Amino acid sequence: MNTYFLFVLLGFFIVLVIYLTIDPNIEKFGIEYSVSYPNIEEIKNKLTVNKNSYFEFFKLLDAQARNIKFSFKDFQEKYNSSILEIDQKEKNNFDRFYKDVVNMIPLKKRHQILIPNLKIAKFSGIENDYPHTHSDIIFFSKSVFENDLSNYQSLENNKNLLSLAKTLIHEINHIKLRQNPTMYDTLFNQWGFKSISPQYLNQTLPNNIISRIRINPDELPDYRFWVWRNKSIPLAIYSSTDITSISDTIIISVDWNNPKKYTYLDDDDDFIDYFKIHVNHYHPNEILAEYHSIYFMELTKQLTDTDIIKTEAYKLLKKTL
């Protein structure tokens, strides 16, 4: 009887240990992370055919910054002509690059910052050639394919390509958030952000700020504005009404209690001390994407600035992953 009881007890403990040690995300370990390259017509359909799209959000300065006439037809023609074919060699190079990015990330962590099927497009002559996203597609400029990855060998000890990998993770996060726009609202609230409607902003902020807010495809179509700690509204706005590029931008902090008053966001010591970043910090979506790219660098032991990972904001992010 005692022997039987001991065997039962031993069996119970074995089952308990197995239960406690199996990762709840074990089913995600077998995910294969692939890359696909939509054809040009598919990209055009997602980017320019639907009038309830990117261009619906354009203001006069958004068109001016892109050197486009303010009409849907001109927007459509400009963006359609920017999309380029990706040849087989370029696809092979990007495939190898992405495979190396995936393999750098510990197996159990990959699902936290990657998506199963990455869609990539190539473009030239729009958005200042900055990487960006539309729908479920990440857009990279032709220089990425024709220069950065033209003779791809390895990520190892290549700072430029590691920077590209970090950018890729940033853009992937925009895709993930677009698929589930409210998935990080609890985190944003913990960071001190509270969502405010565009209608409220239009009624409250002076026109010389509202008319200069810069559109960003990565935050669309579910763009929301946010106030931080009931004291400031971070915004990216055009530096003047006489701009010639989307880079003619300043990042400001609008006083929540006095909307006619603003300072540069980098001069908001409380904000900067809390997040510890000076780029991509004008919107919680951008902070989130930047933190994911920093998390990638931490996971792959490439991180040099350790101050960020010590912040409360970054630690709160990691708890959500």
Give the positions of each predicted feature.
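Intrinsically disordered, compositionally biased terminal peptides
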Residues: 1-48, 52-55
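Auxiliary, metal-adjacent structural segments of Zn-dependent hydrolase domains
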Residues: 71-143
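Second-shell loop/turn segments in exported
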Residues: 81-90, 144-158, 275-280
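Soluble non-cytosolic domains of exported or imported proteins
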Residues: 85-96, 158-163, 167, 279-287
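Sec-exported extracytoplasmic/periplasmic mature domains
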Residues: 106, 173, 177-181, 294-298
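Non-catalytic terminal regions of proteins
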Residues: 115-122, 145, 161-166, 173, ...
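Active-site scaffold of zinc-dependent metalloenzymes
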Residues: 123-169, 173, 178
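Metalloprotease/metallohydrolase-associated module, dominated by Zn2+-dependent proteases
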Residues: 189-321
